[in-house]
Amino acid sequence: MPEATPFQVMIVDDHPLMRRGVRQLLELDPGSEVVAEAGDGASAIDLANRLDIDVILLDLNMKGMSGLDTLNALRRDGVTAQIIILTVSDASSDVFALIDAGADGYLLKDSDPEVLLEAIRAGAKGSKVFSERVNQYLREREMFGAEEDPFSVLTERELDVLHELAQGLSNKQIASVLNISEQTVKVHIRNLLRKLNVRSRVAATILFLQQRGAQ
């Protein structure tokens, strides 16, 4: 009986060391073959449109084009490969954004290597694959509905910053009100924008005001 053809994998991550580690893990499985690597979203899109790839392992937080933007572009281009997010982020906002955008799986980089490899194998066969923490988020969303509080992923301090931001205060003014440094304010704003999956202070403010008005 002829051996089954290995499924073709592309690894997309802006950290060379991580790409090497994932490649070494996949090389333990004769049923898989890494045929491409990309260090950024644009390169991944180019390779995905030129090569016959079965599985794309896509990092979320990359320099330049984010994993979400890359995923959206791949789907717009009609790429049919199984796209599995492989990331350190277990924020529910990231999970829902990527899955709603069409990801076929969401795996965490701190997963046990054997568990990770088994999940990738299952994904190559067409299954939806998620780490346990991600499955928990999905079960909770199904149980309580998609209209959950979008701010539940924020820390108390991030909520404080967002509240002041929505009042139109500058970073310097927020720092004064909350008695923290202006640099700390910038860090909190960057983190809350990422968690809320919005790109600007204005978008975060609009979301905050809309949600507050709905309550």
UniProtKB/Swiss-Prot annotation:
Instruction: List the molecular function annotations (GO) for this entry.
Output: ATP binding; DNA binding
Q: Which GO terms describe its biological process?
A: nitrate assimilation; phosphorelay signal transduction system; regulation of DNA-templated transcription
Q: Give residue ranges for domain HTH luxR-type.
A: 147-212
Which stretches make up the Response regulatory domain?
A: 8-124
Keyword Methyltransferase annotated: no
Species whose genome carries this gene: Escherichia coli (strain K12)
Q: Which SMART domains match?
A: HTH_LUXR (SM00421), REC (SM00448)
Q: Does the keyword Disulfide bond apply?
A: no
Indicate what this protein is called per its UniProt record. Nitrate/nitrite response regulator protein NarP
One Pfam match: Response_reg
- According to the UniProt entry, which residues carry 4-aspartylphosphate? 59
